[in-house]
Amino acid sequence: MAAKLRKGDKVVVLAGRDKGKEGTIASVDPKAGKAVVDGVNMAIRHTRQTQTSQGGRLPKALPIDLSNLALLDSNGKATRVGFREEDGKKVRFAKTTGETV
């Protein structure tokens, strides 16, 4: 199946402790059905000090399930994504506004 959410998409979290937060997708893992969203699902990772890095407690964005994310349309509202053909190419569009993504 084609990817409805891709890297660089602006999304909103639908469920979980970060419900309502918005962010941009940094990476997508289609096999696992998860995506890393900037500023969402953050966890503290402890790193040891080395010659090159300071070390300490660093925040890291963890993967979140794709089913808990929704694309934001041009109005800033959560929308579902559909597919249609334009000029012989398969394109994604927002179901709320009908605009191509």
UniProtKB/Swiss-Prot annotation:
Record key words, sorted: Ribonucleoprotein, Ribosomal protein, RNA-binding, rRNA-binding
Source organism, top-level taxon: Bacteria
GO molecular-function term, one example from the UniProt record: structural constituent of ribosome
The keyword Ribonucleoprotein belongs to this UniProt entry's keyword annotation: yes
SUBUNIT field: Part of the 50S ribosomal subunit.
Family of the protein in this entry: Belongs to the universal ribosomal protein uL24 family.
Purpose of the protein: One of two assembly initiator proteins, it binds directly to the 5'-end of the 23S rRNA, where it nucleates assembly of the 50S subunit. One of the proteins that surrounds the polypeptide exit tunnel on the outside of the subunit.
Entry protein name: Large ribosomal subunit protein uL24
Organism: Ruegeria sp. (strain TM1040) (Silicibacter sp.)
Lineage: Bacteria, Pseudomonadati, Pseudomonadota, Alphaproteobacteria, Rhodobacterales
